[in-house]
Amino acid sequence: MAGAKEIRSKIASVQNTQKITKAMEMVAASKMRKTQDRMAASRPYAETMRKVIGHLALGNLEYKHPYLEERDIKRVGYLVVSTDRGLCGGLNINLFKKLLTEMKEWNQKGVDIDLALIGSKAVSFFGSVGGNVVAQVTGMGDNPSLSELIGPVKVMLQAYDEGRLDRLYVVSNKFINTMSQEPQVIQLLPLPKADDAELKRKSWDYLYEPDPKALLDTLLRRYVESQVYQGVVENLASEQAARMVAMKAATDNGGNLIKELQLVYNKARQASITQELTEIVSGAAAV
């Protein structure tokens, strides 16, 4: 009956693991609702900022800000948003695959790449595969603030201001729904022009007070910060959704494994009982 005891021990072990994954699924579901609320609250601001900036890029401005001017591309920068924790399916690896594909294309063109990493998974990944990491931040938790992101953003903006970067992107996961999260690469600088057909049919002119330079310097930096923050918030919602789905799958798989082990255990127990009965009958016949 040693085999049956071993199987019974495995069943107990899987049941304990199943309890853990079920608890993690419930925690992730609760956190996902909170992050969705935060994402929904910040999204209108980020989208409005994007529209305003799109108007500016199309407009005939009396002051041409450096962030609006295209440059010859010699070096690009990526702000990479990942998670701090794992157990969220292929969320991070899908993001890294998309980024590596883009990096390979730039390398083939002879363009250098700088990376600013947000999240310990990105730090760990690019520590292994290599990359020119110029800034990083980890441990922001479930309630990230803009002040925690200022460091990497400031490093990349300073490099762009000094002409060491010619293009800047943010890479993160876009939350579509609970079952679907999509890696995305968004160009931050130079400012992309609005691609909405209705906006392109209109001409945009603005009056600036007190003066265009002071206003645009502040507005355009706020735009970059808002897009990075929105990327972090959406990535966090994607993380919790992916973790909830992954833990549910693990719980379901645990249930299936328990059923299989229970069947094996019953067969082993039946074989053991049959053997004992055979031995008893054989002993009685010998007497």
UniProtKB/Swiss-Prot annotation:
Keyword field: ATP synthesis, Cell inner membrane, Cell membrane, CF(1), Hydrogen ion transport, Ion transport, Membrane, Transport
Localization of this protein: Cell inner membrane
Superkingdom of the source species: Bacteria
Gene Ontology molecular function, alphabetical: ATP binding; proton-transporting ATP synthase activity, rotational mechanism
Classification via InterPro entries: ATP_synth_F1_ATPase_gsu, ATP_synth_F1_gsu, ATP_synth_F1_gsu_CS
UniProt GO cellular component terms: plasma membrane; proton-transporting ATP synthase complex
One Pfam assignment: ATP-synt
The family this protein is said to belong to: Belongs to the ATPase gamma chain family.
Subunit comment: F-type ATPases have 2 components, CF(1) - the catalytic core - and CF(0) - the membrane proton channel. CF(1) has five subunits: alpha(3), beta(3), gamma(1), delta(1), epsilon(1). CF(0) has three main subunits: a, b and c.
PANTHER family: ATP SYNTHASE GAMMA CHAIN (PTHR11693), ATP SYNTHASE SUBUNIT GAMMA, MITOCHONDRIAL (PTHR11693:SF22)
Identification of the protein by name: ATP synthase gamma chain
Gene: atpG
